[in-house]
Amino acid sequence: MSYLMLDLLSLDVSEAEAEMLRHPQVGGLILFSRNFTSREQLIALVQQIRQIRPEILIAVDHEGGRVQRFREGFTLIPAMGDILPAAKGDMALAKRWACELGFLMAIELLACDIDLSFAPVLDLNGISQVIGKRSFSANPDEVIALARSFIEGMAQAGMGAVGKHFPGHGSVAADSHIAQPIDEREGEVIFNQDILPFKELIFNGKLSGIMPAHVIYPKVDPNPAGFSSYWLKQILRKELGFNGVIFSDDLGMKGASFAGDYVGRAKAALDAGCDMILVCNDNPGVMTLLNGFVWPEAAPQHPASLLKPNMAQTALALENSARWENAKQLAEQIQLAQQAKV
């Protein structure tokens, strides 16, 4: 059971939303900026959610840079693409910084009882404006090195990592939130470049989850990756050996319209191999699925509960206030270094 992750409309849980959260197919909740005014309000909201569904996986997109949902009362995490330039190309220094920023991002969320950030971005920085500096670099080896360090920092705080957007979103100009991106490159290029960060981090056991792209790679497969059993079952599961959780990207995005209405999208994503599907910014769409979709009878083979934090590790990390404070100063230092270049 529990194949669906949904969201909330505002700063607290309405009665209708509470009923949805109690549905056995709901296993996750993603928070957005509209759900946040302050750290204190966020903690109260999470407590309200936990009273309704104590075990639910609470997630957020909190990568740093322009994709950071909570700001007031949180450290502003630099964009991942700013780390190596701020270190003036010193990879050893940049890796240390990436580790501390991963720790900082994770511990500030875990301190508010939020389980997961959908991070890091493993796309290569190419022509995609929606990716841009969300990516560590245009170079696969640099992405691998910095992402690995960032993930290790997250793990030291007790949080698992979700790599996105498999097999790579960086080489399409279109934004899948509002359009259907098509990557016309040959499969050989994708496998020799974009997929390398995913491959390497899976091989080294660093990824607990992966989110595929709503991108079509027609030279490889006619379906968007998130609706493609070739990409998810053949490549990701079989060839790369990934045994973590596969999250769909938001089924409300334009890039998901390929599969029809919400029922069609949910079926296509689950049939392709997703373990949990996200439906955001559309409560009627959620209700359509909860009331009108025939869900799989069996539980997900890779349940999203695998992404729950390592609470013993988190407890230790919360005691390390000196590391937390030093990481805050580092984040500010990197931000200032990049502002000075503008």
From Swiss-Prot:
Reaction(s) this enzyme catalyzes, per UniProt: Hydrolysis of terminal non-reducing N-acetyl-D-hexosamine residues in N-acetyl-beta-D-hexosaminides
Function: Plays a role in peptidoglycan recycling by cleaving the terminal beta-1,4-linked N-acetylglucosamine (GlcNAc) from peptide-linked peptidoglycan fragments, giving rise to free GlcNAc, anhydro-N-acetylmuramic acid and anhydro-N-acetylmuramic acid-linked peptides.
InterPro entries referenced in this protein's UniProt entry, alphabetically: Beta_hexosaminidase_bac, Glyco_hydro_3_AS, Glyco_hydro_3_N, Glyco_hydro_3_N_sf, Glycoside_hydrolase_SF, NagZ_Beta-hexosaminidase
GO MF annotation list: beta-N-acetylglucosaminidase activity
HAMAP family cross-referenced by the UniProt entry: NagZ
Localization: Cytoplasm
Record keywords: Cell cycle, Cell division, Cell shape, Cell wall biogenesis/degradation, Cytoplasm, Glycosidase, Hydrolase, Peptidoglycan synthesis
Any one of the GO BP annotations: peptidoglycan turnover
Family designation: Belongs to the glycosyl hydrolase 3 family. NagZ subfamily.
Pathway: Cell wall biogenesis; peptidoglycan recycling
Protein's organism: Shewanella oneidensis (strain ATCC 700550 / JCM 31522 / CIP 106686 / LMG 19005 / NCIMB 14063 / MR-1)
Lineage of the species this protein comes from: Bacteria, Pseudomonadati, Pseudomonadota, Gammaproteobacteria, Alteromonadales
Primary gene name: nagZ
Name of the protein in question: Beta-hexosaminidase
Top-level EC class as recorded in UniProt: hydrolase
Active site positions, chain numbering: H177 (proton donor/acceptor), D249 (nucleophile)
Positions annotated to bind substrate: D61, R69, R134, K164, H165
EC numbers on record: 3.2.1.52
A Pfam short name: Glyco_hydro_3
